[in-house]
């Protein structure tokens, strides 16, 4: 089978006189994309076999002409541009409904969940709380929509009118470790402070030091008011948050002599010998409990995993 390269660099054509079937394999020769010029194709010296490099997977489609193979430009790999921190803005999701779908994808990338359920949850955002905030970068090109690079949810706190509970804090994976999480938290603190709130609460499993660097300290559990008709009492909330009650210590065996029933026949048995001094002495007092390590917590989430409650006055 003969292969001919056409003048267009993005097309691979077959000799019109010979149009046998074109098969794609994944283990012999390789068809790779030039990283400098993506539409250009490079072929290995072997002509009869055409394969894709597993490191780059642009989708390929056959055009109606049976002898033409083209790249679909709509499926080219897209990289998330790195925005500048001063250009980022915070906006409530209910003020930008056209970005709700992109926000749902961002959250589901971290915590997979039904898309319909996620969109429904985001649709509950309102100025009356709970309120979902998006961290947005400016339009990458004129006329394009902003890019959602972060999200956080704010809810009122039961019995604490000047507090908010921060939940579902997430930053796009390619942008983590570059200051976008700090920018998101500082922005929502300013957002809450401007509306009269004075304290923020949150929970974390593995970001204790990140929040500690932002000024958060270990705190007590609180309940966010997501739906007013499903409020839990403070007693029930603390019952779920407190660690299980410690088991009572095992009782020491009674070493004193017990009365032995007398036999109806024969003389009574002699009394037992006295116990050794080492067994009758009282045990030494237990040492004072050690202070709790910063990496330990007595609270558990609904799955039983350790969780840290933190708070900060703003």
Swiss-Prot record:
GO terms for cellular component: cytosol. It is an enzyme of class 2 (transferase). Residues 260-295 are annotated as: Disordered. GO terms for biological process: actin modification; N-terminal peptidyl-aspartic acid acetylation; N-terminal peptidyl-glutamic acid acetylation; regulation of actin polymerization or depolymerization. Residues 90-243 form the N-acetyltransferase domain. GO terms for molecular function: acetyl-CoA binding; protein-N-terminal amino-acid acetyltransferase activity. Acetyl-CoA binds at residues 169-171, 177-182, 207. It comes from the Eukaryota. Residues 267-292 have a biased composition (Pro residues). Its main location: cytoplasm. It is found in: Cytoplasm, Cytosol. Keywords: Acyltransferase, Cytoplasm, Transferase, Tumor suppressor. InterPro entries: Acyl_CoA_acyltransferase, GNAT_dom, NAA80. Its EC number is 2.3.1.-. Substrate binds at residues 113, 118-121. It catalyses: N-terminal L-aspartyl-L-aspartyl-L-aspartyl-[protein] + acetyl-CoA = N-terminal N-acetyl-L-aspartyl-L-aspartyl-L-aspartyl-[protein] + CoA + H(+); N-terminal L-glutamyl-L-glutamyl-L-glutamyl-[protein] + acetyl-CoA = N-terminal N-acetyl-L-glutamyl-L-glutamyl-L-glutamyl-[protein] + CoA + H(+). N-alpha-acetyltransferase that specifically mediates the acetylation of the acidic amino terminus of processed forms of beta- and gamma-actin (ACTB and ACTG, respectively). N-terminal acetylation of processed beta- and gamma-actin regulates actin filament depolymerization and elongation. In vivo, preferentially displays N-terminal acetyltransferase activity towards acid N-terminal sequences starting with Asp-Asp-Asp and Glu-Glu-Glu. In vitro, shows high activity towards Met-Asp-Glu-Leu and Met-Asp-Asp-Asp. May act as a tumor suppressor. PANTHER family: N-ACETYLTRANSFERASE 6, N-ALPHA-ACETYLTRANSFERASE 80. Belongs to the acetyltransferase family. This is N-alpha-acetyltransferase 80. It comes from Mus musculus (Mouse).
